């Protein structure tokens, strides 16, 4: 018989990796005319005829006005003039150190790494930066950011970066297995730890040469809740109909749920009681959890909410919206004493801003569904409560560099989160406080002025943050919008307090609930994996 040997017989894979092979074919009736037209166009432009002219594909761009009007991505606008940070973002395409040239410098063309973005910011203090390899693993969702840029202006160079990146994320960065711990299975691999060369670790785990950096298991290397990005993958399904992207979103959503809520094991729930629930103001394996709350006020919880939102956008399952509300209620409170959060300890708590951004997306979703209920008002009042605190207490991170471990311009890029929160606090606040608009504009001016002259502005992490958060400023140009939902005062009661009695009560309730689906195999598996790890250390 006839055999098509299109693909290599053997492909080296590490745990949780996969390899997707694709080939393109084209069938066109007016085949010769198409070739002649392309050749004629190239000759007229005095350009050589491309070898791929026969397999050239048609690429469609989207009308920016239409995208803005239909609110398919409701928290940004595409129809307005470019944002104030657009020229900085465009350096990712036009600068000498653009994304394409970064790939060339590091020779990132092997199948495992192709599409990956070079984490050049980690080489800031390296002796030989061009020989420093660090894996980025989609931190701050550049897949989303680049896709938003493609939709914003239709520049096909973004598309040339997006397509291999999304395949790399699905094949390599996502830990596609069910044979590890539940809090690892199906998760997104963490980026290489800061300012360390990847050495021998590829994308999978810590290198043996990193032992000094992982004391106390605080370093990167494996899946962790604070590194979960689903929005870029969601857009790949919406725009290109990629079913594997949709499946990856569902998988990441299930993983991060297991990471924070557990897999249903009674032993696991008991372990959480001892290591997380009864601890107060301490760093735990899910993050820094304030007394009385189940979830930490950080980017991990934000990622959990965003994953649920993205999964809902793809499936329309109502239970996901209720789950978002439950997480928000167990993370902050509209009447809490924010001073107890120690938010001025920037290194430990700056990512509360990412949580507030997730609350904004939840509120916009609730408004689009016309679900104006107690969950909506809890989240809205909580957002404004923290927004007022920000007006009176927040300042630029780099104004106090002594409070930062690495005072570089990544901190300047992170200011865009505060700016966008201020904009949406204006949108949701009942008194239409103009201070929110003033602060938002001031922050954008600060970011633009500083990064326009910064040599660090072209670094991958800086650009990823800006791209991920671009588009909000345009929403508020001209006549700034305000929520059409009339304000309604709701009593939210007192914020929760941590006591041993309440922790044990919640524990016993969970044991009763979990016992309904008790599985001896699940309990054995949970214990066996951990005993095996202990024996190997």
Predicted segments, located by residue:
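Membrane-proximal basic amphipathic "stem/tether" segments
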Residues: 272, 476-537
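Eukaryote-biased recognition of C-terminal alpha-helical segments
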Residues: 393, 397-429, 441-492
């Amino acid at each position: 018989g006839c055999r098509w040997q299109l693909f290599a017989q053997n492909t080296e894979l590490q745990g949780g990796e996969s390899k997707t092979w694709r080939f393109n074919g084209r069938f066109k009736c007016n085949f010769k005319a198409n070739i002649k037209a392309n050749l004629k166009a190239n000759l007229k432009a005095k350009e050589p005829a491309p070898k791929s002219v026969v397999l050239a594909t048609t690429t469609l761009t989207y009308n920016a006005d239409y995208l803005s009007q239909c609110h398919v991505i409701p928290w940004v606008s595409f129809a307005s003039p470019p944002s104030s940070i657009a020229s900085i973002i465009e350096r990712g395409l036009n600068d000498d150190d653009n994304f394409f040239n970064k790939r060339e410098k590091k020779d990132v063309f092997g199948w495992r790494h192709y599409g990956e973005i070079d984490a050049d910011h980690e080489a800031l203090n390296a002796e030989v930066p061009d020989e420093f390899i660090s894996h980025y693993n989609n931190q701050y969702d550049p897949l989303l950011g680049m896709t938003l840029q493609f939709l914003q202006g239709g520049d096909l160079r973004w598309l040339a970066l997006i397509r291999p990146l999304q395949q790399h994320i699905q094949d390599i960065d996502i830990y596609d297995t069910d044979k590890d711990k539940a809090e690892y299975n199906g998760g997104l691999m963490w980026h290489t730890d800061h300012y360390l060369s990847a050495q021998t670790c590829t994308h999978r785990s810590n290198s043996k040469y990193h032992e000094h950096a992982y004391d106390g298991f605080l370093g990167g290397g494996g899946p962790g809740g604070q590194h979960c990005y689903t929005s870029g993958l969601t857009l790949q399904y919406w725009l290109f109909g990629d079913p594997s992207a949709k499946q990856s979103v569902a998988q990441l959503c299930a993983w991060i749920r297991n990471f924070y809520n557990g897999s249903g094991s009674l032993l696991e729930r008991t372990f959480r009681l001892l290591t997380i629930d009864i601890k107060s103001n301490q760093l735990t394996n899910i993050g820094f959890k304030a007394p009385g709350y189940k979830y930490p006020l950080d980017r991990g919880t934000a990622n959990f909410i965003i994953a649920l939102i993205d999964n809902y956008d793809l499936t329309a399952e109502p239970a996901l919206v209720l789950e978002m509300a439950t997480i928000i209620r167990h993370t902050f409170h509209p009447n809490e004493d924010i001073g107890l959060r120690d938010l001025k300890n920037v290194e430990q708590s700056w990512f509360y801003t990412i949580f507030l951004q997730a609350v904004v997306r939840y509120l916009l979703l609730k408004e689009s569904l016309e679900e104006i209920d107690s969950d909506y008002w809890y989240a809205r009042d909580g957002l404004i409560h923290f927004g007022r605190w920000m007006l009176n207490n927040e300042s630029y991170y780099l104004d106090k560099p002594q409070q930062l471990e690495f005072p570089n311009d990544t901190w300047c890029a992170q200011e865009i989160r505060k700016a966008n929160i201020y904009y949406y606090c204006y949108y949701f606040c009942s008194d239409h406080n103009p201070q929110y608009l003033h602060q938002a504009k001031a922050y954008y001016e600060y970011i633009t002025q500083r990064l326009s002259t910064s040599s660090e502005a072209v670094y991958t992490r800086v650009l990823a943050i800006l791209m991920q958060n671009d588009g909000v400023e345009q929403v508020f140009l001209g006549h700034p919008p305000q929520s059409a939902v009339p304000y309604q005062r709701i009593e939210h009661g007192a914020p929760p307090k941590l006591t041993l009695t309440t922790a044990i009560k919640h524990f016993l309730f969970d044991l009763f609930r979990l016992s309904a689906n008790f599985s001896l195999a699940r309990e054995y598996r949970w214990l066996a994996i951990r005993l095996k790890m202990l024996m190997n250390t």
